[in-house]
Amino acid sequence: AAAAAGKSLDEVADIAQYTADNMATLAVAMRGATHPVTGAVLGELPDDEMEIGMGQHGEEGGGRCKIKTADETADIMVDALVKDLELQRGERVLLLINGSGATTLMEQLLVYRRCVKHLADLGIEVAANYVGELLTTQEQAGFQMSMVRMNDQLLEYWNAPCNTAYFKK
């Protein structure tokens, strides 16, 4: 959007760097992915456990724990991202919930609903959002949560029309 608005390459690079510096992501998995060719399970998890911080392809992450409710999981992840970004009351974020592949849109929306409430309780506004699947892993149950600290310029670019092969708004 910045390039389409006529920004120079240096300006676009600065905006991209600001975004990268003000973004954090955390994933949770309730079931590991499967290899699309061999069917081998990548990152096997017991049925009663989940892993917060698991990588996109089953890499071990921040630790395993007993399965928690969607609200409990959302709260843990929001708190971790808010801390990582050092977000303060009055700030705005872009909140993205990306389904891992075997997580339904309804489940993703339940997590999103709780995130919005928890962030509001912390005095942080969800100024923009995306809930759905952008990057998936075959048969992995879980999701990634990303937050980006928003300023007026980023919000303007996020809200600009977009029409690519995969992402449209």
Regions found by a protein language model. Give the residues of each.
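Hydrophobic transmembrane alpha-helix bundles
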Residues: 5, 47-56, 64-75, 123-138, ...
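Mixed-charge interfacial surface used for oligomerization/domain docking
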Residues: 7-109
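C-terminal non-catalytic interaction/assembly regions of soluble proteins
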Residues: 80-169
